[in-house]
């Protein structure tokens, strides 16, 4: 290795001066409130499902290993090294490594907290060669056939270099073969144990997908899943591909369905087409026929792994991301109720006492918080998905690349507010346990909770954009005492205007417009930073502790 190159590499590694000591590390860990995740499986699961549950958790643990490999090539070796260090510092490092599933702190802009690793998470994680540039990739895919170009930019491949140093495409089923064979075996065993036909079908097809790299049939089967054990396992979200947002990280959620809450909330799905037909966007961009099936599930989390359990915990998700499945069957919304309740109790309530005026604190509502998350997830399934750009059939995700996640998360938040306001205006939520003031006040308090995660991550950047937009419109005001309030005379029209702008960006695949908006609004302004400075000591999120093992 030539000395200049060696010096350049060494300067990229986290140095001892940058690495937190034991006290600092314990302070970082304390930002996550340990929370035991419990649900009654004794009375709600059959003997066969209880056997299946054990095998599903076994498969989920393998997903943890795959995801760590996806995040960084050196992760597994580092994890094993940390486990062998019995010192207090070593134990703290292992603890925080496990929270993040790697040596970079999600809450600190992916900065390293361990020595001897790159000072920041590689933007392309381990989906691409670490020395690959964006320009090299784009030039390379220009030389490929249409089929290979789709594979190179698809969810389920990694990009490697061949013996000559040329970029090449490797399917997940090859890259993670040994791990996926083990996970497929556990899924097959779970499928054999359960007596539920839809769970058996999904697990069997997902096991086959792990080895074939074709997830389409198993995604359709996941849409049809109707079982007490509500399982999500496989490669889904693309947040860790910060270069293009193409590559899916492996995740697992093993959940117990909440039958009572699912029945209560199912009526939302009956009004999705009506909401789509009235979105604040040009009529030509609306979808006249949404997918025929849009199931909603309210569940309690029993176990999560991989991309589903690192850093900030997911409170709900809307999948799959394959536009073919969304067009044919819609998408499924899964609400993790016990996770949401834990976040509300541990973070949102104490935050509200520091950023909201006293009278506004009385408007805080878990029902409003829970229902807006539901509306957020519903909103991922409406709006533009298949679009035309310069005569080409494409999607907002493909056109907006690495900007898509932040825009889509903001669109889901704001469309969720629009949806609930529409339903209130049309007397569709007459039995709701919250009112307009509670909805917008709780949304504002929740925004501060989300913004504490920083703006490096899609959700945080999208939330900063929302708050700054609403403040510029006068819909959110900063008080002299450092608290914030909603102007109820302006917030409805401001939300509608913002929703129009975000939906139009997606409908037109406007990368340049999205970049302008995010660069201008997706930042932490000084007035917001002052508010965050008052939140020290409040946990930022939860650290789930699973009763099911």
Task: Go through each PLM region and give its residues.
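Long, well-structured alpha-helical subdomains associated
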Residues: 417-516
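Bacterial N-terminal signal peptides
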Residues: 4-14
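Extended, compositionally biased alpha-helical segments that mediate assembly or anchoring
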Residues: 495, 499-549
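Structured alpha-helical bundle/scaffold domains in large eukaryotic membrane-trafficking regulators
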Residues: 75, 222, 456-459
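Short amphipathic alpha-helical segments that mediate assembly, nucleic-acid/protein binding
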Residues: 6, 134-137, 463
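Fold-level signature of zinc-dependent metallopeptidase catalytic domains
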Residues: 25-55, 147-423, 427-429, 433-447, ...
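N-terminal helix-rich structural modules
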Residues: 11, 18-202
């Amino acid at each position: 290795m030539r000395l200049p190159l060696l010096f350049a590499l060494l300067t990229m590694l986290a140095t001892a001066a940058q690495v937190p000591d034991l006290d600092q590390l314990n302070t970082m860990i304390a930002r996550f409130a340990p929370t035991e995740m419990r649900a009654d499986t004794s009375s709600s699961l059959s003997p066969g499902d209880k056997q299946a549950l054990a095998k599903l958790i076994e498969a989920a643990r393998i997903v943890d290993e795959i995801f760590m490999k996806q995040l960084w090539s050196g992760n597994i070796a580092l994890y094993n090294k940390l486990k062998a260090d019995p010192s207090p510092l070593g134990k703290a490092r292992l603890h925080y490594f496990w929270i993040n599933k790697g040596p970079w702190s999600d809450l600190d802009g992916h900065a390293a907290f361990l020595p001897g690793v790159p000072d920041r998470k590689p933007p392309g994680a381990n989906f691409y060669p670490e020395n690959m540039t964006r320009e090299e990739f784009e030039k390379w895919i220009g030389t490929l056939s249409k089929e290979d170009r789709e594979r190179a930019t698809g969810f389920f491949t990694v990009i490697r270099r061949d013996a000559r140093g040329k970029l090449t495409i490797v399917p997940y089923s090859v890259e993670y073969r040994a791990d996926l064979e083990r996970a497929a075996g556990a899924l097959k065993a779970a499928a054999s144990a359960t007596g539920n036909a839809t769970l058996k079908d999904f697990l069997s097809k997902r096991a086959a997908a792990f080895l074939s790299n074709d997830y389409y049939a198993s995604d359709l089967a996941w849409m049809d899943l109707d079982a007490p054990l509500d399982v999500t396992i496989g490669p889904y979200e693309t947040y860790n591909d910060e270069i293009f947002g193409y590559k899916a990280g492996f995740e697992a959620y093993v959940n117990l369905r909440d039958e009572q809450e699912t029945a209560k909330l199912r009526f939302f799905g009956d009004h999705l087409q009506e909401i789509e037909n009235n979105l604040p966007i040009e009529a030509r961009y609306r979808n006249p026929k949404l997918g025929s099936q849009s199931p909603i599930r309210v569940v309690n989390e029993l176990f999560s792994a991989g991309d589903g359990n690192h850093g900030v915990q997911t409170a709900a998700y809307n999948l799959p991301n394959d536009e073919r499945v969304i067009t044919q069957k819609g998408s499924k919304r899964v609400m993790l109720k016990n996770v949401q309740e834990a976040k509300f109790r541990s973070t949102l309530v104490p935050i509200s006492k520091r950023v909201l005026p006293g009278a506004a604190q009385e408007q805080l509502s878990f029902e409003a918080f829970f229902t807006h998350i539901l509306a957020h997830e519903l909103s991922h399934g409406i709006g533009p998905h298949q679009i035309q750009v310069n005569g080409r059939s494409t999607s907002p995700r493909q056109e907006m690349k690495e900007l898509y996640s932040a825009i889509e998360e903001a669109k889901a938040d704001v469309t969720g507010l629009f949806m609930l306001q529409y339903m209130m205006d049309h007397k569709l939520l007459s039995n709701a346990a919250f009112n307009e003031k509670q909805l917008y006040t709780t949304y504002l308090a929740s925004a501060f909770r989300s913004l504490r995660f920083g703006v490096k991550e899609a959700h945080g950047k999208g939330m900063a954009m929302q708050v700054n937009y609403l403040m510029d419109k006068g819909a959110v005001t900063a008080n002299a005492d450092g608290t914030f309030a909603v102007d109820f005379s302006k917030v409805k029209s401001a939300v509608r205007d913002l929703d129009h702008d975000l939906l139009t960006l997606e409908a037109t695949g406007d990368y340049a417009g999205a970049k302008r908006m995010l660069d201008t609004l997706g930042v932490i302004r000084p007035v917001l930073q002052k508010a965050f400075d008052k939140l020290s000591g409040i946990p930022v999120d939860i650290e789930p502790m699973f009763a099911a093992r």
